[in-house]
Regions:
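Short catalytic/ligand-gating loop segments at beta-alpha or beta-beta junctions
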Residues: 211-215
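Alpha/beta enzyme core
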Residues: 4-12, 27-52, 60-76, 84-207, ...
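Basic/polar N-terminal segments that are highly enriched at the extreme N-terminus
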Residues: 1-3, 309
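Acidic-and-aromatic substrate-binding clefts and catalytic sites of carbohydrate-active enzymes
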Residues: 55
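C-terminal alpha-helical cap/extension of soluble enzyme domains
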Residues: 226, 237-309
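Generic N-terminal amphipathic, Lys/Arg-enriched alpha-helix
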Residues: 4-21, 277-281
Length: 309
């Protein structure tokens, strides 16, 4: 089975009132853990590659690992470019075999964002590739994406409609209060569900995307800190809020920080408890299992995407 796009995935998710997890990948163990969970849960799956992942591993290596996962499991997997910052990066990934790309022009003025997005949409659609765009800016840090809280802006519903109509993008990442990184809220977590509902009502049937949606699972934070880490104050998006978002037209929920925490917590624990171990397989194997268990939980209890294939 070849890589697949998201159009049919999102149609089913929207109609079924659930969301599909888009998990950021950086190496073999992360890919294996995520894919094993998707196979066990029979869940649709998006694997996505950020600027940091491309710099770290090279998207060609990651592409081959994803192709191996498809050959091994037979799962329908979408390979997505996360936060493509310009036309050339999106073009390279379209030409390289990605089935979905994101053009992130959210830091630019509205008209410039439209023009950037429209150009990518035209190129990608001619080659059968779907395009995600972004309107509104999330605070926080994720690889090359860094936005101060003072520069963050929520998505304007009226602009969202105009943006989709003028660009032809296939899905839209919106800002309703989530943020990148492990420190998403200083106080009580809040998402603007009234804004989300308004956007959904104004764009009926249209798939929306939430970035910065890791829960920053407390047990992983505690384990990291217990075994030498320093993640005081880390806080994410409560799982019940993410489950609710899937009922309001959010078809894709991005998860990265929770993967990092699952792997790091497991490795820290293993090396403290087994100080004589130096074979990477000894600590990467349980880390891979930790990722698999966490992703399976997300699919089953948060995204509601289990048994949707």
């Amino acid at each position: 089975m070849p890589l697949v796009g998201t159009k049919e995935m999102f149609k089913k998710a929207y109609e079924g009132g659930y969301a599909i997890g888009a998990f950021n990948v950086n190496n073999m163990e992360i890919i294996q853990g995520i894919v094993a969970a998707a196979k066990a849960e029979q869940s649709p799956l998006i694997l996505q590659v950020s600027a940091g992942a491309r710099k770290y591993a090279n998207h060609i290596y990651l592409m081959k690992l994803v192709e191996a996962a498809i050959e091994d499991t037979g799962l329908p997997i979408c390979l997505h470019l996360d936060h493509g910052e310009d036309f050339e990066i999106c073009k390279a990934c379209v030409d390289g075999g990605f089935t979905s790309v994101m053009i992130d022009g959210s830091k630019h003025p509205f008209e410039e964002n439209i023009e950037m997005t429209r150009r990518v949409v035209e190129y990608a659609h001619e080659r059968g590739v779907v395009v995600e765009a972004e309107l509104g800016r999330l605070a926080g840090v994720e690889d090359a994406v860094k936005v101060n809280s003072k520069d963050a802006t929520y998505t304007d519903p009226d602009q969202a409609v105009e943006f989709v109509e003028r660009t032809g993008c296939d899905s839209l990442a919106i800002a309703i209060g989530t943020s990148h990184g492990a420190y998403k809220f200083k106080g009580k977590p809040e998402l603007d569900f009234a804004r989300l509902e308004k956007i959904t009502n104004m764009l009926p049937g249209y798939p929306l995307v939430l970035h910065g949606a890791s829960t920053v699972i407390p047990s992983f934070v505690e384990e990291c800190n217990k075994y030498g880490g320093k993640l005081d104050g880390a806080q994410g998006v409560p799982e019940d809020m993410l489950l609710q978002a899937g009922k309001f037209g959010v078809c894709k929920i991005n998860i990265d920080t929770d993967l990092r925490l699952a792997m790091t917590a497991s490795i820290r624990k293993h090396l403290v408890e087994n100080p004589g171990d130096f074979d990477p397989r000894q600590y990467l194997k349980p880390a891979r299992q930790a990722i698999q268990d966490m992703v399976a939980h997300k699919m089953r209890d948060v995204l509601n995407s289990s048994n949707r294939l």
